UniProtKB/Swiss-Prot annotation:
Listed Pfam families: Oxidored_q4
Enzyme class: translocase
Keyword annotations from UniProtKB, A to Z: Cell inner membrane, Cell membrane, Membrane, NAD, Quinone, Translocase, Transmembrane, Transmembrane helix, Transport, Ubiquinone
Family: Belongs to the complex I subunit 3 family.
Name listed for the protein in its UniProt record: NADH-quinone oxidoreductase subunit A
Keyword Transport part of the UniProt annotation: yes
Reactions this protein catalyses: a quinone + NADH + 5 H(+)(in) = a quinol + NAD(+) + 4 H(+)(out)
Native organism: Rickettsia bellii (strain RML369-C)
InterPro entries recorded: NAD(P)H_OxRDtase_bac/plastid, NADH_UbQ/plastoQ_OxRdtase_su3, NDAH_ubi_oxred_su3_sf
Lineage, opening ranks: Bacteria, Pseudomonadati, Pseudomonadota, Alphaproteobacteria, Rickettsiales
Amino acid sequence: MLQNSELLQEYLPIAIFFGIATLVSSLIMILPNLLATKKYNKDKLEPYECGFEPFDDARSKFDIRFYLVAILFIIFDLEITFLVPWAISLGTIGKIGFFSMMFFLFVLTIGFVYEWKKGALDWE
């Protein structure tokens, strides 16, 4: 077993890496704000639409169903992120891992059927 000093030496390169990464990313975020010339112009603050004056407000209303479909997409996209590592390690996790994932898929299927029956996927 590693002693405390040996353990700290093992993690020292990782700590140095995170320190340098934090410093570089902070510099990248701060330096442009300090060094850039700031010329405020009315035209630069306008939304750009093919060189013409904007015809309409840039903010348009979306139907709430678009947000619902986006949330459903995120949920089922997360399902895939759980399925891929499970499928890769299926040979080593045994029956318990298999049946736990089947239960997970069953719960997601119940949720999908519920959304379908409630009409969340209908566009009419």
